[in-house]
């Protein structure tokens, strides 16, 4: 939990959360209650919304939106060792998919790729198909199937204890939308009623068909005037003949929409998705003069133009503040 000074610095006071109630060495059994495609249209990717009943286990009623849980796939790896736990973001509100905290869900993308050399010792001619063990196991499960689960995990990438004290900018790429689905539901559809906070979600994808939970999010935006849903499609040609760009390009182009939000004392920023998003967003904040509430830049980088930052220097010299929550992979 943050210190009492948070009330004076506009930092969020985070709630106490349960963690590691179910360790990987002693998983519990959940049961799949739903598995459905959650993409807007036909795509080169395969992403499923998978719901798991954890009633009667320590996970029941113990997780919060923004946390993660673990899945242990059956079988052994190439060393004949049991597969290790894989973590997945919880895509459900704190009250669960069922409203009682008994069913949690995640947003799982199948990993399907070709082998490619990553070290000088790897076989350069190898190009056979590689399929992710846990993602495909999880996506293959059918309603009624049992699955070993652990968790919950995570204490910082959560909503503040008093959500109404803050406004929100959520930035997501791909399956990074998962925790925001739950958080936005908590903010707008929680038991205490919708908050009046200003809430913006920016979702970045390669193609329109890659949008996740699009119908649900648009319905929420239509119903709640304080919730604004923005999509950024990077590889499709826009009406003006240009490509859509990435999230940081969108923020730069639409700064007139977000400058007031970002400069406000109440605003919290959450980023979730591919790690490549982090550099562009941090550069945008610094370049626009909006970085102070969200970034701590070490002296080594303070006199360097943000456009000259690279991933290595950023990781070494830029840290998010308590008002910037980061979950990238």
Regions of interest found by a model, annotated:
Residues 160-165, 263-265:
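Short helix-loop-beta connector
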Residues 60-82, 173, 178-200:
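Classical protein tyrosine phosphatase
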Residues 33-141:
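Ferredoxin-reductase
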Residues 144:
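Active-site-proximal polar cores
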Residues 148, 167-171:
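Conserved beta-strand elements of the Class I
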Residues 75-78, 150-156:
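Short, charged beta-turn/beta-strand-edge "cap" motif at the junction between a beta-strand
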Residues 69, 147-149:
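Generic structural signal for buried aliphatic residues
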Residues 2-10, 17-28, 43-45, 195-329:
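Reductase modules of NAD(P)H-dependent flavoproteins
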């Amino acid at each position: 939990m943050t210190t009492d000074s948070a009330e004076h610095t506009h930092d969020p006071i985070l709630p106490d959360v349960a963690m590691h109630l179910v360790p990987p060495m002693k998983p519990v059994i959940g049961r799949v209650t739903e598995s459905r495609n959650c993409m807007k249209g036909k795509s080169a990717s395969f992403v499923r919304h998978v719901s798991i009943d954890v009633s009667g286990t320590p996970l029941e009623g113990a997780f919060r939106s923004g946390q993660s849980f673990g899945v242990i796939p059956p079988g052994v790896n190439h060393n004949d060792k049991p597969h290790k736990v894989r973590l997945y973001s919880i895509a459900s509100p704190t009250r669960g998919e069922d409203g009682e905290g008994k069913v949690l869900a995640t947003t799982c993308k199948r990993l399907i790729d070709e082998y490619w050399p990553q070290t000088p010792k790897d076989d350069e001619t190898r190009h056979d198909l590689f399929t992710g063990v846990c993602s495909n196991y999880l996506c293959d499960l059918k309603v009624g199937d049992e699955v070993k689960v652990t968790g919950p995990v995570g204490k910082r990438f959560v909503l503040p204890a008093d959500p109404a004290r803050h406004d929100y900018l959520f930035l997501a790429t791909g399956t990074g939308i998962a925790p925001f689905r739950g958080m936005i539901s908590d903010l707008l559809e929680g038991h205490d009623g919708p908050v009046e906070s200003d809430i913006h979600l920016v979702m970045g994808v390669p193609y329109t068909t890659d949008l996740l939970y699009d119908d649900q999010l648009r319905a929420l935006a239509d119903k709640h005037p304080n919730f604004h849903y923005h999509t950024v499609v990077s590889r499709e040609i826009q009406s003006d003949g240009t490509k859509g760009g990435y999230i940081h390009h969108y923020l730069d182009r639409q700064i007139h929409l977000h400058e007031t939000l970002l400069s406000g004392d109440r605003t919290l920023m959450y980023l979730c998705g591919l790690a490549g998003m982090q550099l562009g967003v941090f550069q945008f904040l610094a370049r626009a003069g909006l970085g102070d509430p969200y970034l701590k830049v070490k002296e080594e980088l303070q006199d360097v133009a943000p456009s000259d930052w690279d991933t290595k220097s950023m990781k070494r010299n830029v840290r998010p503040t308590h008002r910037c929550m980061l979950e990238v992979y």
